[in-house]
Amino acid sequence: MSKTLLMPNDRATFALGQWLGERLVAGTVLLMMGDLGAGKTTLTKGIGRGLNIPDEIDSPTFTLINEYDSGRLPLYHVDLYRLEGAESDRLFLESYWEGIEYPPGIVAIEWAERLRYLPPEPLKIALAHHPKAVRQVTLTPSSPAQTCLVKALTTDAILADEI
């Protein structure tokens, strides 16, 4: 079961991220896919706001991983744009989602299509430009809890604070 939403502007994409950040549980891995400028970082900034992280959320394009631990849950923001194939294996990302070396939190992976193997039960988020809106966001859950979360998600719910 997937759900697709049309986001009328960047604020709506941010609001979707905030809505998710307020509801996600520790150990959630978000696999974000989409072209340049599709809104992956904007969505992650909203997630940070929803997690009550006071720090500015920046794209880790050059650092590869940014860690934020001052919110309701830690946020591990990963950007695989500059990596290819086996290079992502060397980041040992499983140490983030397994909660062994790092406290369990939210792992948000941009350019997740570059991963060679997927974590268990990720929430897949595909972002794309759309002719009738700024972007289209499709969420595909892989666990019962994520399915409940996605079912509860409506454009009206996330845009309520924008009106």
Task: Please provide the spans of the model-predicted regions.
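N-terminal pre-Walker A segment at the start of P-loop NTPase domains
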Residues: 1-19
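Short phosphate-coordinating micro-motif centered on Lys-Gly-acidic
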Residues: 3, 86, 92-163
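Phosphate-binding P-loop
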Residues: 21-27
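Hydrophobic anchor at the beta1->P-loop junction of P-loop NTPases
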Residues: 30-32
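Walker A (P-loop) phosphate-binding loop of P-loop NTPases
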Residues: 37
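Conserved lysine of the Walker
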Residues: 40
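Conserved nucleotide-sensing/catalytic segment adjacent to the nucleotide-binding pocket
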Residues: 56, 61, 67-110
